[in-house]
Curated annotation (Swiss-Prot):
Domain ATP-grasp: 134-332
Location in or out of the cell: Cytoplasm
Protein family per UniProt: Belongs to the D-alanine--D-alanine ligase family.
Protein name: D-alanine--D-alanine ligase
Species of origin: Helicobacter pylori (strain ATCC 700392 / 26695) (Campylobacter pylori)
Amino acid sequence: MEFCVLFGGASFEHEISIVSAIALKGVLKDRIKYFIFLDENHHFYLIEESNMHSKYFAQIKEKKLPPLILTHNGLLKNSFLGAKIIELPLVINLVHGGDGEDGKLASLLEFYRIAFIGPRIEASVLSYNKYLTKLYAKDLGVKTLDHVLLNEKNRANALDLMNFNFPFIIKPNNAGSSLGVNVVKEEKELVYALDGAFEYSKEVLIEPFIQGVKEYNLAGCKIKKDFCFSYVEEPNKQEFLDFKQKYLDFSRNKAPKANLSNALEEQLKENFKKLYNDLFDGAIIRCDFFVIKNEVYLNEINPIPGSLANYLFDDFKTTLENLAQSLPKTPKIQIKNSYLLQIQKNK
């Protein structure tokens, strides 16, 4: 089976997506037929496999590549010989952050009937917004930490709105990769941390920070009616997983398995199933959990994890190919114009 990797995007995680695509190239190798790069101006470009390395993208603004146009079933390439359709194999949406995880690309791909692996529109909207993710989890009976949502209008009242004490953690509500995330241990650090978070999002989420909390990551997908899980990872961290810890090492081959009881592993999987069903059908996602006093709490849902979290799976290639055979299908609406014909008949 062949794939097309779509990466880049107009987001703060643009470079992360490039590194993610390069890492996935090393895993899938010749199974990737095309690499399609989306730049910050929303132009699509075909990148040769030999150019899939960091040095090329560090200088890509100096390149003169012919832009492609997204159309039904593929991409349109114009040349002096005329227009040519590049028919795409199954697309892997590997655009992190805005464009890829907020629903824009899912909408485009569905609109043009291009088959893809990745979160659909509703899944993207709910998981990209951390506050909406918490509401979604609560409705499913999955625990989350206490939290406060701030915007520019109420940020001055942050301390009054919180029902928890220092230390706490501040996160942009619409950004991933730990960008703009800071731990605040005393009041004098608050303004700086808020300024940093508001650079990435119009809304900011504040949660209590629990030193030394156990954190577990679990990736997976649903293939037909059965779930396929990765093994559980317990990430090595200091205070929290910052940008460098999260993304500058996801090209690793394998991550260490967590040492946890069968009962706890089953709890993590049951919570994952609740969150996945059926919203995330067609996607490989990673759920990051906290365990506090033997209770499982959702930290966040990563709808497009770095390099699709391939390093957590014992047989990632088989998982991906099986998922490709179990993608959700949008029913085609038959337009019959019977109502219009009846109106015409009655005239």
